[in-house]
């Protein structure tokens, strides 16, 4: 089922590309350059956004799993509050604080 969906999209995309290129060729011959350049830039933007969308659909979950790592690192891959190899030193109320004396 996925193959038919992809092939249908590719067929439509190729049809649009063929129509766009034939229209562009006709405008090029008639020297209507403003319209041709506008359509070329518009096509480039649409193509770029489509490529970004397809890349995000393909690699989006991987990027999210890297960005939002689970575990000791906290959110967004930060450092843990207390490194695992160093002990946590907690001061008790009976312990006096050391002060610098001159």
Curated annotation (Swiss-Prot):
PANTHER family attached here? T-CELL LEUKEMIA TRANSLOCATION-ALTERED GENE PROTEIN
User: Which protein family is named in the record?
Assistant: Belongs to the TCTA family.
A biological process term (GO) from this entry = osteoclast fusion
Species in which this protein is naturally found? Xenopus laevis
What GO cellular-component annotations does this UniProt entry give? membrane
- Coarse class of the protein's main subcellular location: membrane
Q: Which UniProt keywords apply?
A: Membrane, Transmembrane, Transmembrane helix
**InterPro entries (UniProt xref):** TCTA (IPR016560)
How does this chain sit within the bilayer? Single-pass membrane protein
Positions of transmembrane segments:
36-56
- Subcellular location field: Membrane
Protein name according to UniProt:
T-cell leukemia translocation-altered gene protein homolog
Q: Which Pfam families does this entry report, sorted A to Z?
A: T_cell_tran_alt (PF15128)
């Amino acid at each position: 089922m996925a193959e038919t969906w992809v092939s249908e999209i590719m067929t439509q995309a190729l049809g649009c590309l063929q129509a766009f290129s034939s229209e562009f060729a006709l405008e090029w011959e008639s020297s209507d350059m403003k319209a041709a350049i506008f359509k070329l830039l518009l096509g480039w933007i649409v193509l770029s956004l489509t490529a970004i969308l397809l890349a995000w659909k393909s690699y989006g979950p991987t990027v999210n799993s890297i960005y939002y790592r689970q575990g000791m690192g906290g959110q967004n891959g930060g450092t843990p509050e207390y490194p695992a190899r160093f002990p946590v030193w907690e001061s008790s109320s009976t312990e006096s604080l050391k002060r610098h004396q001159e």
